[in-house]
């Protein structure tokens, strides 16, 4: 389904001969729960792999993950499923450091500054220590830089590269 990046455009798109909005209304009447679009994630890649954690039924669970990849489709499916499980478990903030909001980085740095001051470090020591902690935080918080839970000797990016694919994006939704 390739239609655009606004909720209204997606609702008007056709899926299996019906509009997405109609499919949603049918699901509401079948399940008995009101549902609305709250978030929209646009992913670009040749292959998009899905994973539902703690699935109650097919496609329904507490955590849903989509991973977009480029490269050989079979290899992308295989590594994509593992990466999706990793995302469900680790809940990264962004794909890369560039995707982490500046206010999040500033807030983390403030925490490190506070910790260093509590430990009685000098002003120069506070700045030096907090500046070393921010890159560590970014490495642990971004998907491609995280240690891969399925092989902790490698990062997610290294594992994808070895599989001959590139991870171009992901979306994680939890209820």
Residue spans for each PLM region:
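N-terminal assembly/interaction segments in proteins that build large macromolecular machines
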Residues: 1-175
């Amino acid at each position: 389904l390739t239609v655009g990046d606004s909720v209204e455009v997606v609702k008007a798109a056709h899926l299996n001969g019906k509009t997405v909005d109609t499919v949603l209304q049918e699901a509401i009447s079948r399940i008995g729960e009101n549902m609305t679009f709250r978030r929209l994630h646009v992913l670009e890649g040749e292959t998009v792999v899905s994973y539902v954690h703690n699935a109650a039924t097919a496609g329904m669970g507490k955590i849903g993950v989509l991973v977009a990849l480029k490269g050989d489709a079979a290899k992308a499916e295989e590594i994509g499923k593992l990466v999706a499980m990793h995302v469900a478990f680790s809940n990264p903030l962004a794909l890369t450091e560039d995707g982490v909001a500046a206010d999040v980085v500033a807030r983390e740095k403030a925490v490190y500054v506070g910790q260093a001051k509590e430990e009685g470090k000098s002003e120069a020591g506070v700045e030096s220590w907090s500046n070393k902690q921010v890159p560590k935080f970014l490495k642990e918080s971004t998907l491609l830089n995280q240690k891969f839970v399925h092989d902790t000797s490698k990062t997610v990016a290294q594992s994808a590269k070895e599989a001959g694919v590139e991870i171009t994006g992901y979306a994680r939704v939890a209820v």
